[in-house]
Amino acid sequence: ASGSAAASGATGTYIPGTYEGTAEGISSTVKVTMTFSDSAVTDVVVDTSGETASIGAAAADELRDQLLAAGSAEIDGVSGSTITSEAVMKAAKSCYAQAKGEAVVSSVQLPTGDENDWLGTEPDIDEAAITETVDTDILIVGAGNGGMFAAAYAAANGLNFRIIEQNGNVQDTRHWYGAIDSAAAKAAGEEPFDRAKLLSEISRYASGKCDQRVVKTWINESAEMIGFVREIMTEKYGVNMIYTYGDEAKWPAENAEHNTDFMYPEIEYTYDRSSGAARNELLLQYIQELGYDVDFKTSLAKLEKNSDGRITGIIAQSTEDDHFIRYNANKGVLLACGGFPGNPYMMEQLDPLGTSVTTACSYSPADKGYGIRAAVWAGANLDKEAAPMLFDRGIVAPGVDGGYVDSDTAFGGKAFPGTIRQYNPGTQPFLKVNRNGERFANESSPYNDIVYAAAHQPGRVYAQICDANILEDAKRFHTIGCSAQTRNGGEKYFQGKVDEAVADGSL
């Protein structure tokens, strides 16, 4: 989007010329190009084409108009496009600084590495560039699901902590989560689960490629976690908890006749989203009411450690003005930075199989694995095998293959071809065939099984075949977990998913 006008200042304010600024948006590098006379901005070009098509990318014209009208980089932004708007403002600030002859501090590009070396090199930051110091006992890096849980618990116990987040808001809430033998389970009359058997089953399902100590921690402490969250969500903010148990939490018995006899612990919890409340936002409100807050727009640059190898804190960077901040954490640093689905370098090199069969993703594009890289730079041991969570819902048009396609705007020059976040009916175990019309796997399986089976088929994709009785069949299949939305949502929900796929050209 481009446009011309004259946002004026005093004569001689600017060095006439055209300047370019960039900043990381939610899924791409946002670029702003501004032309200055000696007293005014005469032209602005905003390129957000790599952002989400219907959100950030669509906001380019309005953001350009705001920059032209404001005569500065301080604009209101576009509602619903917060991260893209902030990136545009940051890029515009760089243009203004250049036009005024000011030194522009170059930021540490957090998504480092390349197609041959996913890790890249730890940034070398000059001490003179560190202009702020924060002392705390505990530092939490990342205000997503893990980070906000940790922050809420720390706040409830009056601990001295800080929490930072590279974006301008808390990250998406994962509404479904699990716990063993909670108070809700006891109230529903559920018998205590065989914890030793569950530990063995989870290890078997992972082919033994797991740390059973971590699994055991979840088994033994998840009920306490659920109780703590319920105190906040239900008792404090009045958001009801939904517990899935009984027959609703199990596949039909006939499924085991010619299939794996899975275990079905009643572990599924979520909160009523019809209230409009997102758990992470309420957790933010909770810690704020206790006198804490999140240091937003603050990115991890590197971990620091002493001569004994102990982590003592981090160096962070403000994503607003690029100044560096040292956080000294006397008792420790908790990394809650998520994975690396938004980084094709890491995806292809660390998980080539999962990458090859993926068509569409419902991940955060800002999740580029920087916390993992920083930990490895500091000496952490990285699991030798990736553990992706794949859903069988990445609907794409006929003829589209699984895996990356080239992209001029996405980070790393690659993106997955699908544009629909999740086509929930895709999980239903209807007939699934390859491009030759051949059935190739048992469709009644956990989410990722059919996806991996497609790795051996043409294009690494398949077609799902069903008829007009899909809702009746979905009730009979009685799949569980979040796939139950197709069954429980009824005709309105299903038709909405179909209409979205038809409009997208995928169905």
Label every PLM stretch briefly.
Residues 155-174:
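Glycine-rich FAD pyrophosphate-binding loop
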Residues 114-135, 437:
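A short, basic/flexible loop-to-alpha-helix module at the beginning of a structural domain
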Residues 9-109:
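Active-site- and interface-proximal helix/loop "cap" or "latch" segments in soluble metabolic
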Residues 320-323, 327-401:
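Glycine-rich loop(s) and the adjacent beta-strand/alpha-helix scaffold that form part
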Residues 128-146, 162:
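Beta1/beta-strand and adjacent pyrophosphate-binding region of the FAD-binding site
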Residues 372-374, 381-507:
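An anion/pyrophosphate-binding glycine-rich loop and adjacent beta-alpha core
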Residues 180-218:
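Glycine-rich active-site loop/strand segments that organize a redox cofactor
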Residues 219-323, 344-345, 395:
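Conserved redox-cofactor binding core of oxidoreductases
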